[in-house]
């Protein structure tokens, strides 16, 4: 029913995949991505766990409109999140290669 290796082989493969995924998640958490807005005037750096590590604001913006600065910060944050998710997807692709995952399924769980 389970082919060569039987159920034991299937369980071993599942355990190995789980270990590889955990290792990759740990590696991803250590990586950093930077999102930008306003042609680099606002930069936000997140780690792979989406925790904010750093916010950089060009001094010229301190004299500008408060609402514009808030919009630029939000845009930079959203850009950083998008980049972090892309990076995670690329890194996890090697672990999930050959698995049929449903559309929109995000890794790690």
Curated annotation (Swiss-Prot):
**InterPro entries (UniProt xref):** YbaB-like_sf, YbaB/EbfC
Q: Which residues form a coiled coil?
A: none
The GO cellular component terms are: bacterial nucleoid; cytosol
UniProt xrefs under Gene3D superfamilies:
Nucleoid-associated protein YbaB-like domain
Main localization category:
cytoplasm
Give the UniProt subcellular location, in the record's own words: Cytoplasm, Nucleoid
Subunit details for this protein? Answer: Homodimer.
Q: Which PANTHER family match?
A: NUCLEOID-ASSOCIATED PROTEIN YBAB
Q: What does this protein do?
A: Binds to DNA and alters its conformation. May be involved in regulation of gene expression, nucleoid organization and DNA protection.
Could you identify this protein by its name? Nucleoid-associated protein Asuc_0997
């Amino acid at each position: 029913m389970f082919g060569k290796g039987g159920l034991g082989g299937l369980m071993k493969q599942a355990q190995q995949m789980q270990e590889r995924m955990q290792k990759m998640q740990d590696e991803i958490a250590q990586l950093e991505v930077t999102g930008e807005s306003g042609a680099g005037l606002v930069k936000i750096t997140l780690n792979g766990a989406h925790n904010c590590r750093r916010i950089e604001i060009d001094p010229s913006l301190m004299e500008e409109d408060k609402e514009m600065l808030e919009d630029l910060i939000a845009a930079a944050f959203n850009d950083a999140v998008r980049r972090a998710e892309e990076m995670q997807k690329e890194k996890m692709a090697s672990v999930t290669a050959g698995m049929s995952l449903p559309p929109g399924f995000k890794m790690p769980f």
